[in-house]
Amino acid sequence: MAKSKFERVKPHINVGTIGHVDHGKTTLTAAITTILTRKFGGEAKSYAQIDSAPEERARGITINTSHVEYETDKRHYAHVDCPGHADYVKNMITGAAQMDGAILVVSAADGPMPQTREHILLARQVGVPYIIVFMNKADMVDDAELLELVEMEIRELLSKYDFPGDDTPIIIGSALKALEGDKGDIGEAAILKLAEVLDSYIPEPQRAIDGAFIMPVEDVFSISGRGTVVTGRVERGIVKVGDEIEIVGLRPTIKTTCTGVEMFRKLLDQGQAGDNVGILLRGTKREEVERGQVLAKPGSILPHTKFSAEIYVLSKEEGGRHTPFFAGYRPQFYFRTTDVTGSIELPAGVEMVMPGDNISVNVNLIAPIAMSEGLRFAIREGGRTVGAGVVAKVIE
């Protein structure tokens, strides 16, 4: 039989499991694929298959991640599960696996634990927009009051980090029972309930093409008689011939007009998210544009020098620093296509940051970069990656 081509009929959503070690994230992932493939087709993955997560590299950092996919009634899901806590931290900070929503797994027997809290905080910092809770191992708790207490604790913790704790869906079940074929409320029924909630609670994300136009500048050429051409890959939105464009970052913002879009040496009417294009700019001199700036829809993005960020510092084993750094540390921050030097302010009471740590910091850049919350960057020393980060909040 001929291999069937991937039919994208259903909308595609990216999710992942987060939560404390041994609370059942991987078992739940296995249970979801097993039960949903039985109902909607696809390929079931066992615990062992998911647990042997292959290594990937994102922004020069090695991360172990398992990717599974499944379908529900309405959607197609790509789901990530990580073997270790450090992998989650790295995954969320580098944005290697962007999540439209997360399934927070909490053991009903233990309640929220340190990594539960840390993953919720990380989700807030890196901009995971929605969290659904699966209260796992319900077969180990006989006392209904205890379940209620754990549920209250989870809701309080979510609210503390600005998620809507009172309105967050919490599904009570046992991933192991479901995997063993239990058809009861906490078995298969709980997994099917989770699938329904994924469909109804996580809205369809805005596609990259629907956002405001932005393109990081990779290269600039002048073509005699035609003007200046800027090349890059459109990150978001659409650019059409005749559109007004701002050139943002590194120096004062200037306005110009797109007089041509070309791809593979052909002239187009427009370029859109994902396209590698050359954009011809009217009346702009070659030396007015440089790598590291962005072309953007006027007013849609501003240049900033100061922001708070969540960063992960590579361990020595990962090729990072061998020694800690202190307040005032001045590495380069690599945004999109260029490095900008900046200094790091540590939180009150923190003396130093060790290789392998993740921490919230403030950064002051020496030149402004076009940025908004959720933008990823690498931290480098002389071209070598020593960390990764994500903009949590723009300050000025």
Swiss-Prot record:
GO cellular component assignments: cytosol
Keywords on record: Cytoplasm, Elongation factor, GTP-binding, Hydrolase, Magnesium, Metal-binding, Nucleotide-binding, Protein biosynthesis
Record-linked Pfam families: GTP_EFTU, GTP_EFTU_D2, GTP_EFTU_D3
Region (G2): 60-64
Binding site for GTP: 19-26, 81-85, 136-139
Domain tr-type G: 10-206
Region (G4): 136-139
Region annotation (G5) ranges: 174-176
Highest taxon in the source lineage: Bacteria
Places the protein is found: Cytoplasm
InterPro entries, per database record: EF-Tu_GTP-bd, EF-Tu_GTPase, EFTu-like_2, EFTU_2, G_TR_CS, P-loop_NTPase, Small_GTP-bd, T_Tr_GTP-bd_dom
Chain residue ranges for the region called G3: 81-84
PANTHER family (alphabetical): ELONGATION FACTOR TU, MITOCHONDRIAL, ELONGATION FACTOR TU-RELATED
Role this protein plays: GTP hydrolase that promotes the GTP-dependent binding of aminoacyl-tRNA to the A-site of ribosomes during protein biosynthesis.
Subunit: Monomer.
Similarity comment: family membership: Belongs to the TRAFAC class translation factor GTPase superfamily. Classic translation factor GTPase family. EF-Tu/EF-1A subfamily.
Name recorded for this polypeptide: Elongation factor Tu 1
